[in-house]
Amino acid sequence: MRHARGYRRLNRTHEHRKALFANMAGSLIEHEQIKTTLPKAKELRPIIEKLITLAKRGDLHARRQAAAQLKEDRHVARLFEILGPRYAERAGGYVRVLKAGFRYGDMAPMAIIEFVDRDPNAKGAADKARTAAEEALEE
């Protein structure tokens, strides 16, 4: 029987899984692109889609529901002030999962999960330095 097979357990307890996806969702909202393992990325996608749908609603109840799922208020603020209006016209499909090879240490399949129509300037400091160096080489 296929009872209780609705999601990946990822060898973690319920509390650990909930914290993991709250942290990953916050990182994705902050940086708009993260690299993780393929099963985690596939499991994170519906969580983020639901958060963006809440942000599109934009009312107080939706904000409190999002705050219950995310760990930091700055992620909730960014979700409702930047990402919600950005995807107001799009009916779903806010993130994409791209396969990114295999991790060196254990050959785990890796993936990049990113927002569609993302802001390339929202990346972290290391990525900004790398992209600046690439642009300097091109000129």
Swiss-Prot record:
PROSITE patterns: RIBOSOMAL_L17
Pfam families tied to this protein: Ribosomal_L17
GO MF terms held by the record: structural constituent of ribosome
GO BP field: translation
UniProt keyword terms in alphabetical order: Ribonucleoprotein, Ribosomal protein
Family matches, as InterPro entries: Ribosomal_bL17, Ribosomal_bL17_CS, Ribosomal_bL17_sf
SUPFAM superfamilies recorded: Prokaryotic ribosomal protein L17
Subunit organization: Part of the 50S ribosomal subunit. Contacts protein L32.
HAMAP family linked: Ribosomal_bL17
Family the entry assigns: Belongs to the bacterial ribosomal protein bL17 family.
The protein, known as: Large ribosomal subunit protein bL17
Species of the source: Cereibacter sphaeroides (strain ATCC 17023 / DSM 158 / JCM 6121 / CCUG 31486 / LMG 2827 / NBRC 12203 / NCIMB 8253 / ATH 2.4.1.) (Rhodobacter sphaeroides)
